Regions:
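Active-site rim/loop-helix segments in enzyme catalytic domains that contact anionic ligands
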Residues: 1-98, 227, 233-239
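Metal-dependent de-N-acetylase/amidase catalytic core
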Residues: 1-4, 84-242
Length: 242
């Protein structure tokens, strides 16, 4: 089975659905990762956008090696992702590249602009994935993938439709979150600190707290929640989640 995880930035997937991807890996799925931006403005200490993007892509590739994932970077500007013909074509291309049975992605209602726009772009092109008159670098799909949004901003009060118990892979997920080392100085700076080690602990706690909250909802120790994308004529297959 092919699984495509789509995120807006490096580190989105590690916080939101790394446990699920690890369980997909362990059952033998083919995993694909696509990012709409490379997070090239996500630092106050790295001097240029180009250097920041290169560092963050390298961190993401390190994580993807743990998933055994193939990776595609769409490289739109961080904090500048818009709904255009160009971005739609790029997202359509990424979906066809992976030929997925299952897509995990940002929810379109996420208040972070790049997060929400990434989810919106996925939903906007979904009915075109099989269309022969929608050109891309890869052939049209012969099946409609099942789409589930990971539970992004917990402040939105969304109750997931389904949970994946990630208790057995939680430590590996935590280590993957900590792979995004470039973000420690960014987090420290926005919190008015220069203590990168404190920021590292915050990153670790954020990963564990989010996962523990999902576990409390799912009646297990640690879990990730997902919301099914319902589209006229298609129902996602819940059994595809591990």
């Amino acid at each position: 089975m092919n699984v495509l995880a789509i995120g807006a930035h490096p580190d989105d997937l590690e916080f939101m659905c790394a446990g699920t991807l690890l369980k997909c890996r362990d059952r033998g799925d083919n995993i694909f990762v696509a990012l709409t931006t490379s997070g090239n403005t996500g630092s106050n200490t790295i001097p240029t956008k180009e250097e920041n993007a290169a560092i963050r892509e390298a961190e993401q590739l390190e994580c993807c090696r743990h998933y055994g994932a193939q990776t595609m970077f769409l490289r739109f500007d961080d904090e500048g992702l818009l709904d255009t013909a160009e971005t739609r074509r790029a997202v359509l291309n990424a979906i066809r590249w992976a030929d997925p049975d299952l897509i995990l992605c940002n929810p379109p209602w996420d208040p972070s602009p790049d997060h929400g726009m990434t989810g919106k772009l996925v939903t906007e092109v979904l009915l075109s994935v099989g269309g022969k008159l929608h050109p891309s670098d890869y052939p049209p799909l012969e099946k409609m993938p099942s789409v589930f949004f990971y539970n992004g901003d917990l402040s939105q009060g969304i109750v997931p439709d389904i949970f994946v118990d990630i208790t057995d892979v939680i430590e590996e997920k935590r280590q993957l979150c900590l792979t995004h080392r470039s973000q420690f100085s960014w987090i420290a700076d926005v919190r008015g600190s220069t203590d990168n080690e404190e920021a590292r602990r915050y990153f670790s706690e954020l990963c564990m707290t989010r996962s523990r909250f999902g576990g409390m909802q799912a009646d297990c120790m640690y879990a990730e929640g997902f919301i099914a994308h319902l589209i006229l004529g298609y129902a996602p297959n819940y059994k595809l989640l591990p």
